Each structure stands twice: as structure tokens, then as C-alpha cells.
A protein has these predicted regions:
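Short, basic, alpha-helical segments at the C-terminal edge of helix-turn-helix-like DNA-binding modules
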Residues: 76-81
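Hydrophobic alpha-helical connector segments
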Residues: 83-115, 159
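Short alpha-helical scaffolding segments that buttress acidic/His motifs in well-ordered protein cores
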Residues: 103-104, 118-122, 159, 163-166
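N-terminal intrinsically disordered/low-complexity leader segments
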Residues: 1-23, 195
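Hydrophobic/aromatic-rich alpha-helical bundle segments in the mid-to-C-terminal region
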Residues: 131-132, 136, 148-195
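Amphipathic alpha-helical packing segments from all-alpha helical-bundle domains
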Residues: 83, 109-119, 124-158, 184
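Helix-turn-helix
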Residues: 27, 31-69, 73
């Protein structure tokens, strides 16, 4: 009580505006990924994303001032999912190459649409430098798996390249991926063939 007025301890303002903003931002990112999955990365504009998210174009521009901001956010969402799953593989007590092979194989199953969006956005990074750091993120974690098996940087590079190539191959075919075959290719990539 101060000057006859009872004061309550100040509570942080949690009127939901921040939570609504974060939710709206996430909805716009998910809409961007749906546009990429359906129309390709070239189909992403503030207008197409706004239509997909059922919001105004000005709202997408409010959260993402430039198209690069929108594309980086979309690619970051996919890259975060992949790196989280890769870290789970690294931290588990199971065969990490088997886990990596299963993750690669998922591009031919339930993860196909997401993998296709990631591939398209990563390829776009060749022309849009703002996307490059995010596009490299999953490769760095795959390299960590390689470093658990080999101290030879060529072998680690080969594992990263094999993983990337296998993902592309799966997306280009309708064949059901064989996890054992993928694991064998990944293991083979870690052998340099030189003494």
C-alpha cells in the first residue's frame, strides 16, 4: 500500500498480440511452402502467398518486407526441421547412417512435398545469396555425421554429396526408396579408396 493505494505487482503485458503475430507469421510461412510445393519457388510472390494464406498482400509485406525475406523464412522452416531430425539421429544410440538413410528415403514418401520444397529453395540459393547460409545448414549437420566415421575431409564431402544426390534421385523417380541400398551408398561414400 502506497499513499492509500494498493498496487499489484506489474505483470507482463500478455494481451495475445505477440502470440497472434507469431501465429500469423507461421501461417504465412506455411502458405509460402504450399505455393512452392504446388507451383515451384518461381510461383512465390507476396500476392500468391497472401491468396494462399487468405490474408491481404499488405500483411505478407508487413511480416516479410522483401521476397528474399519470405523465401529465407520458408527455407529456414524446412532446414530447421531437417537439422532437428539430423541432430536426433546424431544423439540417438542407433546407427547414424541408418538414420540418415531413413531420412533421405522419406523424400520418397510422407516427406516428399517438404523435400521438394527444400530442394527447390536450395537450388534458388545459387541465384539468391540471402538463401545460401540457410541452404548450407543441413549439409553442415550431415558433415557432422561424416566426421563421426572419418577424419578424411574428402570422405566427409563425399557423404554430403551422396546424401544430396540421393535426395535428388528420389525426387526424380517414382520408385520406392530402399533404405538398405541408401545406407550402403552412404557407407561407400565414406571410403576414399586411397591409403
Amino acid at each position: 500500500v502506497e499513499h492509500g493505494v494498493t498496487r499489484r505487482k506489474a505483470e507482463p503485458v500478455t494481451d495475445g498480440r505477440r502470440a497472434r503475430g507469431a501465429r500469423r507469421r507461421a501461417e504465412i510461412i506455411e502458405a509460402t511452402l504450399r505455393v512452392v510445393q504446388r507451383d515451384g519457388a518461381g510461383g512465390v510472390t507476396h500476392r500468391t502467398v497472401a491468396r494462399e494464406a487468405d490474408v491481404t498482400t499488405s500483411l505478407t509485406a508487413y511480416y516479410f518486407a522483401t521476397l528474399d525475406d519470405l523465401l529465407v523464412a520458408a527455407l529456414s522452416t524446412v532446414a530447421d526441421e531437417y537439422t532437428r531430425r539430423l541432430h536426433e539421429i546424431i544423439e540417438s544410440d542407433t546407427d547414424d547412417l541408418e538414420g540418415l538413410a531413413a531420412l533421405v528415403a522419406s523424400a520418397g514418401g510422407e516427406g516428399r512435398r517438404r523435400a521438394l520444397a527444400e530442394r527447390e529453395l536450395s537450388t534458388m540459393a545459387a541465384r539468391r545469396p540471402a538463401l545460401r547460409p540457410v541452404a548450407r545448414r543441413w549439409r553442415e549437420v550431415v558433415a557432422q555425421i561424416g566426421e563421426r566415421h572419418s577424419t578424411d575431409p574428402r570422405a566427409v564431402d563425399a557423404l554430403v554429396a551422396a546424401t544430396d544426390g540421393l535426395c535428388a534421385d528420389i525426387l526424380l523417380t517414382d520408385a520406392r526408396p530402399d533404405v538398405r541400398r541408401i545406407r550402403a551408398v552412404l557407407a561407400h561414400s565414406l571410403r576414399t579408396g586411397e591409403d
